[in-house]
């Protein structure tokens, strides 16, 4: 199937006028195609820009500092680890009362390794070893209550639960009289 070029004579005279006279170089069909291509390009780039990292970071391992304490030990320390955090695509129904709720996915651990540290200053009879998770990879999935705290964030996730260790400073380092925690070799 061949296409025929559109000539200026085929376009109505009122569309070919420029400041009251006929433009002999009028190219409306090509300009319209250029505008469509430009619009398509801008729309496709807009979708790309909206999904870039700074705007909505996806579920992935990130560095985090967590407070570690153990009942019976007089110390609360912080450890650097990786946790799973970020956005997962979710949907909700407009008519929630009529239709059942959709399952919501959250950022979960996919592969995890556990590391252990020895808390300093624990009295005899209290095991000083504490283990914590290190996220190797993450995934968006239903919340597994067996391995994940599905509730909202704690008011102060980097603080210790024991009121003796809660103070106005953000430092959770062990007291200077106690040695630093020692890392134990992984399994």
From Swiss-Prot:
Name the keywords, alphabetized: Disulfide bond, Glycoprotein, Hormone, Secreted, Signal
Localization, UniProt: Secreted
Task: Spell out the disulfide connections.
Answer: 59-107, 73-122, 76-160, 84-138, 88-140, 143-150
What are the GO cellular component annotations? cytoplasm; extracellular space
- In its keyword annotation, does this UniProt entry include Secreted? yes
What else the UniProt entry mentions is: Encoded by a cluster of genes that have evolved by duplication from LHB. HCG-beta is encoded by six non-allelic genes (CGB) clustered on chromosome 19q13.3 and named CGB1, CGB2, CGB3, CGB5, CGB7 and CGB8. Two specific hCGb proteins that differ by three amino acids in positions 2,4 and 117 have been described: type 1 (CGB7) and type 2 (CGB3, CGB5, CGB8). The CGB gene first arose in the common ancestor of the anthropoid primates.
Q: Tell me the protein's name.
A: Choriogonadotropin subunit beta variant 1
Q: Which organism is it from?
A: Homo sapiens
